[in-house]
Amino acid sequence: MAFKNAISWFEIPTTDLSRAQKFYETIFSIQMIPFDTPNFQMRMFPVEDMMNGVGGAISKAEGFYKPSATDGPLVYLNANPDVQNVLDKIEAAGGKIVVPKTQISPEFGYMAVFVDTEGNRVALHSVPQ
């Protein structure tokens, strides 16, 4: 058996949902989609086909998880066509670049790592077109 996608959903924790939403909307030039329940608040990343692709969100859920710049899994967000286009917006939006654009290999493209406004370590990935 093989997965269609190894990841089906991800959540990036926030302490200030509005600040995090502004950060991610700025660096990716997107509009996030609100999804709130009595137990948590989310702002989902827009994707072409949420039911068959990989989706994710920034999320605020008291006591469920906390931001970390050093611990836990490292999520790689799609930065196609070029990681640098997103990196150029990180610091002005309130984040910090911790690994600059770095080539993985010619066929696997580039990666970078930043810390967002909430203190989360998040990675970027782009593949040569």
Segments and roles (model prediction):
Residues 2, 11-54, 105:
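Core segments of cupin and vicinal oxygen chelate
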Residues 45-50, 114-117, 127:
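Active-site beta-strand termini and strand-to-loop segments that position acidic
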Residues 1-21, 73-75, 125-129:
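N-terminal beta-strand motif that seeds the catalytic metal site of vicinal oxygen chelate
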Residues 7-15, 64-89, 110-115:
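Vicinal oxygen chelate
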Residues 20-24, 90, 119:
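Conserved active-site tyrosine of GNAT-family acetyltransferases
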